[in-house]
Amino acid sequence: MVALTWDDTGKRQYEMGTDHGVLYPMTTTGTYGTGVAWNGLTAVTESPDGAEANDMYADNIKYASLRSAETFGATIEAYTFPDEFIPCDGGAEVTDGVVFGQQSRSKFGFSYRTQIGNDAKQDAGYKLHLVYGATASPSEKSYETINDSPEGMTFSWEIDTDPVSVEGHPELKPVASITIDSTKVDKKKLTALEKKLYGDTTGEPTLPLPGEVYTMLKAAA
């Protein structure tokens, strides 16, 4: 038997940062189109909701506690956004450089990366975050005069999601988010997934559906 210890060297982990943002616009057929790099990404705040307790009482005692369905939301912040995000933000580009607002909002997928560090190595690994079935809400844009300490304007969007079924795995509930830890996942499988997400010389970047992600990462090495 081994006694518990705390804060061993190399195990004082933390997460920070966000990078490698990718937008995957949803096509009219319900699939995700070619991914585009999202430059200027400054923050992603995940905001899950639901899973609230609904207590049941019988025989003058607490009999059971039921949990409501959980939903996934987030806030994306960035200095800029790709042109492909315009339809997702309720815009229609009627000709080059001319955008009509207050249009239907397209769905999209999204991926980004956060860094894992520890006391021994600041860049020990990273987590990939995949988001499905997202729609963006209108957000405030504040344009201010340039003064002696100018700052770039930050755009912000609150997103809601519709979960997607995990094909071939009825034991799993539909999901809207997947997180992959590079320090634990097989490196070859992770590389194959990243080729899908970011593209390479043999294929365009695309967002694999949850069932495909499961198969890629769960399959025997």
Regions found by a protein language model. Give the residues of each.
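Intrinsically disordered, low-complexity coil segments
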Residues: L4-K11, T27-Y32, A120-Q122, V164-P174, ...
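Generic serine detector
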Residues: T9, S47, S65-S68, S104-S106, ...
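Extended aliphatic helical segments
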Residues: V2, V22, V36, V44, ...
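Mixed-charge, glycine-accented linear interaction segment located at domain edges/termini
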Residues: P138-A221
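Solvent-exposed edge beta-strands and adjacent loop segments
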Residues: M1-D83, V131-G152
